[in-house]
Amino acid sequence: MKDIIIASFYKFIPLNDFESLREPILTKMHEIGIKGTIILAHEGVNGGFAGNREQMNVFYDYLRSDSRFADLHFKETYDNKNPFDKAKVKLRKEIVTMGVQKVDPSYNAGTYLSPEEWHQFIQDPNVILLDTRNDYEYELGTFKNAINPDIENFREFPDYVQRNLIDKKDKKIAMFCTGGIRCEKTTAYMKELGFEHVYQLHDGILNYLESIPESESLWEGKCFVFDDRVAVDQKLDRVYPQLPQDYKYEREQK
């Protein structure tokens, strides 16, 4: 039985006091024994952390004790080993960096599709299926027939849209990412530009892999994750170190 719980979460909400939240959260992580990384910015909070069930429940309760975080949703996966080596709380300009001002996913994100709805929706040949992740993530695994924007980092995504999609504002566009946060921004950005039919996979690829049987899955390959597991398969089991040794090296240089 895998006794380490790995949780990812995010919330877009104005945090005027985000800088003052860093030390209390970090202190609590050390006190409980939680390892992972949490990012705070004016636009909200984003993070991934891990521990045993007792530790995680205590930390969930701590975070939710702030009324602004009372409805935080934690997406859980499981492993035999903690994929984080220490506790970190970082202050940033954005909780996921796209570099575009005045994009507010808290009120203008794309339409959510459950894994089951997504599974049916992306089989429509008239739907543009767009992977919002980086090129090395796409190369490791993606959905069947997904478009690769061929970007090295998320900051390049707006330029991709301007160069390749700006004349397709009337088309149905379905976007996906690992856990959902990047799609919150990409869909909000595209709606600001006037795209009319923008959809996103709720809770991302990890939710789809958990929900759709492997025998029916439209996912092909592995799913990159931002911790020491490097990637997971369709059963959400870690596949590193089955990956080539130089893959992790190349990833760390990006």
Curated annotation (Swiss-Prot):
CDD domains: RHOD_YceA. It holds the Pfam family UPF0176_N. Residues 123-217 form the Rhodanese domain. One of its GO terms (molecular function) is oxidoreductase activity, acting on paired donors, with incorporation or reduction of molecular oxygen. The active site is at 177 (cysteine persulfide intermediate). Catalyzes oxygen-dependent 5-hydroxyuridine (ho5U) modification at position 34 in tRNAs. This is tRNA uridine(34) hydroxylase. It comes from Legionella pneumophila subsp. pneumophila (strain Philadelphia 1 / ATCC 33152 / DSM 7513). The lineage of its organism: Bacteria, Pseudomonadati, Pseudomonadota, Gammaproteobacteria, Legionellales. The gene is trhO.
